[in-house]
From Swiss-Prot:
Modified residue annotations for Phosphothreonine: T305, T370
Main location class: cytoplasm
Domain PDZ: 656-742, 747-822
Reported tissue expression: Brain and spinal cord. Isoform 2 is expressed in testis and brain, but not detected in lung, liver or spleen.
Region LIN-2/CASK binding: start-end pairs: 373-436
Entry text on domains: Composed of an N-terminal domain that binds Munc18-1 and LIN-2/CASK, a middle phosphotyrosine-binding domain (PID/PTB) that mediates binding with the cytoplasmic domain of the amyloid-beta precursor protein, and two C-terminal PDZ domains thought to attach proteins to the plasma membrane. The autoinhibitory helix linker occludes the APP binding site.
Protein name (database record): Amyloid-beta A4 precursor protein-binding family A member 1
Quaternary structure and interacting proteins, as annotated: Part of a multimeric complex containing STXBP1 and STX1A. Interacts with STXBP1. Also part of the brain-specific heterotrimeric complex LIN-10/X11-alpha, LIN-2/CASK, and LIN7. Component of the brain-specific heterotrimeric complex (LIN-10-LIN-2-LIN-7 complex) composed of at least APBA1, CASK, and LIN7, which associates with the motor protein KIF17 to transport vesicles along microtubules. Within the complex, interacts (via PDZ domain) with the motor protein KIF17; the interaction is direct and is required for association of KIF17 with the cargo that is to be transported.
PANTHER family reported in the protein's UniProt record: AMYLOID-BETA A4 PRECURSOR PROTEIN-BINDING FAMILY A MEMBER 1, SYNTENIN RELATED
Species for this entry: Homo sapiens
One Pfam short name: PDZ
One function term, GO molecular function aspect: amyloid-beta binding
Localization, UniProt: Cytoplasm; Cytoplasm, Perinuclear region; Nucleus
Length: 837
């Protein structure tokens, strides 16, 4: 018998068995680090003798087997030792009750104030072991004191001792806390705090069945209480592990996080039913045995404290069923304390279940493999690409069957549905992205037969392709010249068809057989597709279309192409910049026949207007801001032609001038066009021959506009015609000129309130090359063909083109410019040699 310092040794001998052999029951327990650091006071060490299981306990277990199955509990008992414990070949393996599957909170193991708490490593083989423990385990050959945090108490009274029965229950102290201590959950991870019950039962054929029943009920209640606590923890944290990370409750208990303490602090109202359940569960096991036992037998269960026991020593407290052996006073207090603790544990378990149910109702359980949905939609600006597809992807349908519900005219087919019947999703995506462009959801009403949305996607007309021809044209011919060119193209194609019918060789490039085609029109381009094969026959960007004419059921489409130039021509143009205005352009004229000729022409014209709106949108300008009413109000504030009407209406500015000269002598002047956009388009005196009749008279100045010569008006006539009229005065000795005095430099005043309003003219190399009719620039005095000399007092004669454009684009308010005809500027700067007439 070993003796430990500061502890009393107690030996319990089994006299009935007639043996003096004493064995110690060793518990394989692991001590947490917290308790290793804290030195506890020495405790009494208890040694027990060797006993055998009696038949009475087996009979008792048989009687209670049915109840065990109903409750789903398995009380595992063992009374032997197992090999391999503390450098010995025998190890005591304790009974692991079913509640050991569920861990208790590791926070109890980490609490330094609870000196009686300990951790026991759970071994999965314990369940299998307990089934065969009684038959297979060998006897222990050594004695050993139990750890000081194990609490060992004997269950004995006078009758039990006489029957040579002594039962011992090895257990740790329940998670008792003082009233002032904060509550901590008795839950733990896998391998956390566990309860192991070790029971040794000697040969006791006369064992009192009620004592065994009481022990069984106590152990079963403890198992049920801790199992419910662990179950509550698992239910409470199921929502935290609802992503499918665990495959089983065992694995869930193993990897479950610690309980959230804040969730237990929330107060809940427990109804009467839950209160009754708690009361029933907490008192069921304690009252059942007592109700069945006579009062006399109940009184016998309160013997004095066994010799050597220390009921008042710290850390030694038996469960409620065993505290009857402690004493009448201590037993009642300890029993109430234990009962209170059990009720607290049951209350917490019920509370956990209710919380888990509420959270499951309100929380969506989602698989971790489910991708997160974006919280808010993501909007992306449309890239600067053509909304129409390339020719290879186009599959138009016949134009005779327009799409239902479309506002396009009869005979037109929207390409958003007809070109791509197999890709409706992409077409709708383009529409939606286009609607979000610059946050302008609507279009300003554009006159025309088609829906602007359809023109952006593209519409298709059915037509017959008659042929194509080429013409040479000036850069900016008049409308009448355009119509004459269209008629000439039609006549050429008809002549070519007649030659083809007569089987005569037609001129090269002008004979094509009649072909059924689909004419694709959009704000980006115009394509001619073969109706059968859908191959692209011709493809012209919309910006290259210079003219469209409908003559009856004939449609003429003119596209501009610059004629290729040789190096010699480039050298000539470099030395003579005036040749730029006389440059010839190659016009490709396509002739079609269609019943919808007028609709085709109107649709192309509407496509230009919609394309302009798209341009405004791309630059952040709302087309609605440029409404007709608002723009009209702006024009009303603009000075008409910079007071040109007032200047021309003054009599002192308009004069009749008589020039005397010799017969056969030229007048000696150089004239240029006043420029398109002037209030009275006519010719201007750009230069005068030194010593000539015009200069010697002293009545003419450079910049004067000639209204008429000898009664013949020059207003609105081409420059070449005016030159011919002046040359015809060579044989006359007296010439009458009606002129309007004008300075050589024209002053322009444009009022632009903000950047929303476009100036309405374009500039190339400092020369105004186009002008929007009726715009603020035209009313301000801007004229086509004039060179910009000055902008807001700053000379731009030697300024690069890009800088001029930048200055004009960002100018607001009153914009003052000075311009003069480009030809006059070249003559005055000696860039050209004058040709006098």
């Amino acid at each position: 018998m070993n003796h430990l310092e500061g502890s009393a040794e107690v030996e319990v001998t089994d006299e009935a068995a007639g043996g003096e052999v004493n064995e110690s029951v060793e518990a394989d327990l692991e001590h947490p680090e917290v308790e290793e650091e804290q030195q506890q006071p020495p405790q009494q060490q208890h040694y027990v003798g060797r006993h055998q299981r009696g038949r009475a306990l087996e009979d008792l277990r048989a009687q209670l087997g049915q109840e065990e199955e109903e409750r789903g509990e398995c009380l595992a008992r063992s009374a032997s030792t197992e090999s391999g414990f503390h450098n010995h070949t025998d190890t005591a393996e304790g009974d692991v009750i079913a509640a050991a599957r569920d861990g208790y909170d590791a926070e109890r193991a980490q609490d330094p104030e609870d000196e009686s708490a300990y951790a026991v490593q759970y071994r999965p083989e314990a369940e299998e072991y307990t089934e065969q423990a009684e038959a297979e385990h060998a006897e222990a050959t050594h004695r050993r004191a139990l750890p000081n945090h194990l609490h060992f108490h004997s269950l004995e009274h006078e009758e039990a001792m006489n029957a040579a029965y002594s039962g011992y229950v090895y257990t740790h102290r329940l998670f008792h806390r003082g009233e002032d201590e904060p509550y901590s959950e008795p839950y733990a991870d896998y391998g956390g705090l566990q309860e192991h019950v070790y029971e040794e039962i000697g040969d006791a054929p006369e064992l009192d069945a009620r004592d065994g029943l009481r022990l069984y009920e106590q152990e079963r209640d403890e198992a049920a209480a801790y199992r419910q606590e662990a179950l509550g923890a698992r239910l409470h944290h199921y929502d935290e592990r609802s992503d499918g990370e665990s495959d089983s409750p065992e694995k869930e208990a193993e990897f479950a996080p610690y309980p959230r303490m804040d969730s237990y602090e929330q107060e809940e109202d427990i109804d009467q039913i839950v209160a009754e359940v708690k009361q029933s569960m907490s008192s069921q096991s304690l009252d059942k045995a007592a109700e069945d036992m006579p009062e006399a037998e109940q009184d016998l269960e309160r013997p004095p404290t066994p010799a050597g026991g220390r009921p008042d020593s710290p850390g030694l407290q038996a469960p409620a069923g065993q505290q009857r052996a402690v004493g009448p006073a201590g037993g009642g207090e300890a029993g109430q304390r234990y009962s209170k603790e059990k009720r607290d544990a049951i209350s917490l378990a019920i509370k956990d279940i209710k919380e888990a149910i509420e959270e499951v109702k309100t929380r969506t359980i989602r698989s971790p493999y489910t991708p997160d949905e974006p919280k808010e939609p993501i909007w992306v600006m449309r890239q600067d690409i053509s909304p129409t597809r390339d020719c290879d992807d186009q599959r138009p349908m016949d134009g005779d069957s327009p799409s239902p519900g479309s506002s396009s005219p009869l005979g037109a087919e929207s390409s958003s549905t007809s070109l791509h019947p197999s890709d409706p999703v992409e077409a709708s995506t383009n529409k939606e992205s286009r609607k979000s462009l610059a946050s302008f959801p609507t279009y300003v009403e554009v006159p025309g037969p088609c829906d602007p949305e359809d023109l952006i996607d593209g519409i298709i007309f059915a037509a017959n392709y008659l042929g194509s021809t080429q013409l040479l044209s000036d850069k900016t011919p008049s409308k009448n010249v355009r119509m004459m060119q269209a008629q000439e193209a039609v006549s050429r194609i008809k002549m070519a068809q007649k030659l083809a019918k007569s089987r005569k060789k037609a001129p090269e490039g002008e004979s094509q057989p009649m072909t059924e085609v689909d004419l694709f029109i959009s704000t980006q381009r115009i394509k001619v597709l073969n109706a059968d094969t859908q191959e692209t026959m011709m493809d012209h960007p919309l910006r290259t279309i210079s003219y469209i004419a409908d003559i009856g059921n004939i449609v003429v489409l003119m596209a501009r192409r610059r004629m290729p130039r040789s190096n010699s021509q480039e050298n000539v143009e470099a030395s003579h910049p005036s040749q730029d205005g006389k440059r010839q352009y190659k016009m490709i004229c396509h002739v079609f026949e269609s019943e919808d000729a007028q609709l085709i022409a109107q649709s192309i014209g509407q496509a230009f207007s919609v394309a302009y709106q798209e341009f405004l949108r791309a630059n952040g300008i709302n087309p609605e801001d440029l409404s007709q009413k608002e723009y009209s109000d702006l024009l009303n504030t603009q000075d008409m032609y910079n007071d040109d009407l007032i200047h021309f209406s003054k009599s002192e500015n308009c004069k009749d001038v008589f020039i005397e000269k010799q017969k056969g002598e030229i007048l000696g002047v150089v004239i240029v066009e006043s420029g398109w956009g002037s209030i009275l388009p006519t010719v201007i005196i750009a230069n005068m021959m030194h010593g000539g009749p015009a200069e010697k008279s002293g009545k003419l100045n450079i910049g004067d506009q000639i209204m008429s010569i000898n009664g013949t008006s020059l207003v609105g006539l081409p420059l070449s015609t005016c030159q011919s009229i002046i040359k015809g005065l060579k044989n006359q000795s007296r010439v009458k000129l009606n002129i309007v005095r004008c300075p050589p430099v024209t002053t322009v005043l444009i009022r632009r309130p903000d950047l929303r309003y476009q100036l309405g003219f374009s500039v190339q190399n400092g020369i105004i090359c186009s002008l929007m009719r009726g715009g603020i620039a035209e009313r301000g005095g801007v004229r086509v063909g004039h060179r910009i000399i000055e902008i807001n007092g700053q000379s731009v004669v030697a300024t690069p083109h890009e800088k001029i454009v930048h200055i004009l684009s960002n100018a607001v308010g009153e914009i003052h410019m000075k311009t003069m005809p480009a030809a006059m500027y070249r003559l005055l700067t000696a860039q050209e040699q004058p040709v006098y007439i």
